[in-house]
């Protein structure tokens, strides 16, 4: 095995670990959400996340927390609160695999928001595949079905929140340290969550606290896995593997919750996956052309 192939496989391995962690988060959130309110889950998740990040703050020094954009961190925290509480609540009323397929639609929302907030010019083929992608989202959510539950739209609200976070990250992440972005967002989200969580408070059991700690620490762990992966392979090289998360979710949901995706979820995935792949690769080409022209 040559060095290039070894580096590629190692990078993909790190990326797959991030997918496993992400699926585990959804499973844990769904399990916790059956008893604890999504506001309380969000509070503990980000409270523990901020605790886990403290050793890194000490290691890198207090200068790593210096920021010239406090309002950006507050905005990220508010979006995280809204996104994660909506996502956790959605998991309590819909299968894990439905959540996974909806998460694949986030690049579609990001593309639209980029037009308004980043002044990006979008070529017409990307608009076409975006429309097709949203058709896939409609197929997944089945708003036309007799048993349609409108509360499943919380997933869509969460996806929009996460897309807005992507826009903010694109604009500001290169100007702030990663530790400060993670730490301040976790602190703000925990603070915002606490007052509303107290209205629905149920004291977690020891086992639930352990799961909440795992949930809080895994967010940073996912980022670590992704950074390791992207240090070895290009982000577009990992794109096709992103959709293995659906396979992981199907297996986990079946064995833990006895869930299996319905035909609409699978049909929606078949539509959404190629459209988002097209967007990812076309964005990469656009970035390459931009760098070549500079």
From Swiss-Prot:
Keyword annotations: Amino-acid transport, Cell inner membrane, Cell membrane, Membrane, Repeat, Transmembrane, Transmembrane helix, Transport
Predominant location category: membrane
InterPro entries in the cross-refs: EamA_dom
Subcellular location: Cell inner membrane
Domain EamA: 21-141, 160-280
Membrane topology summary: Multi-pass membrane protein
Residues that span the membrane, as ranges: 8-28, 41-61, 74-91, 98-118, 121-141, 148-168, 177-197, 207-227, 237-257, 260-280
Recorded GO CC terms: plasma membrane
The protein's role, per its UniProt record: Transports S-adenosylmethionine.
Family membership: Belongs to the drug/metabolite transporter (DMT) superfamily. 10 TMS drug/metabolite exporter (DME) (TC 2.A.7.3) family.
Protein name per its UniProtKB record: S-adenosylmethionine uptake transporter
Source species of the chain: Rickettsia conorii (strain ATCC VR-613 / Malish 7)
Name of the coding gene: sam
């Amino acid at each position: 095995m040559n060095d290039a192939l070894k580096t590629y496989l190692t990078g993909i391995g790190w990326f797959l670990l991030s997918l496993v962690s992400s699926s585990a988060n959804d499973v844990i959130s769904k399990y916790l959400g059956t008893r604890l309110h999504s506001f309380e889950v969000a509070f503990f998740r980000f409270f523990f996340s901020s605790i886990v990040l403290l050793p890194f703050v000490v290691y890198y020094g207090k200068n790593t927390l210096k920021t010239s954009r406090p309002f950006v961190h507050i905005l990220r925290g508010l979006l995280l609160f809204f996104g994660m509480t909506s996502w956790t609540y959605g998991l309590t009323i819909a299968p894990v695999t439905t959540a996974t397929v909806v998460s694949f639609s986030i690049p579609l929302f990001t593309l639209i928001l980029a037009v308004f907030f980043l002044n990006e010019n979008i070529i017409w083929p990307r608009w076409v595949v975006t429309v097709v992608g949203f058709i896939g989202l409609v197929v997944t959510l089945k708003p036309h079905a007799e048993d349609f539950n409108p509360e499943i739209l919380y997933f869509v609200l969460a996806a929009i929140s996460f897309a807005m976070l992507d826009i903010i990250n694109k604009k500001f992440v290169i100007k702030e340290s990663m530790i400060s972005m993670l730490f301040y967002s976790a602190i703000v989200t925990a603070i915002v969550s606490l007052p509303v969580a107290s209205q629905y408070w149920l004291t977690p059991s020891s086992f639930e606290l352990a799961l909440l700690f795992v949930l809080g620490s895994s967010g940073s762990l996912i980022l670590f896995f992704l950074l390791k992966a992207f240090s070895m392979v290009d982000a577009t090289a990992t794109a096709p593997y992103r959709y293995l998360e659906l396979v992981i979710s199907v297996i986990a949901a079946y064995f833990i919750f006895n869930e299996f995706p319905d035909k609409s979820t699978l049909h929606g995935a078949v539509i959404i996956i190629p459209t988002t792949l097209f967007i990812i690769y076309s964005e990469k080409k656009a970035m390459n052309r931009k760098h070549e022209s500079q």
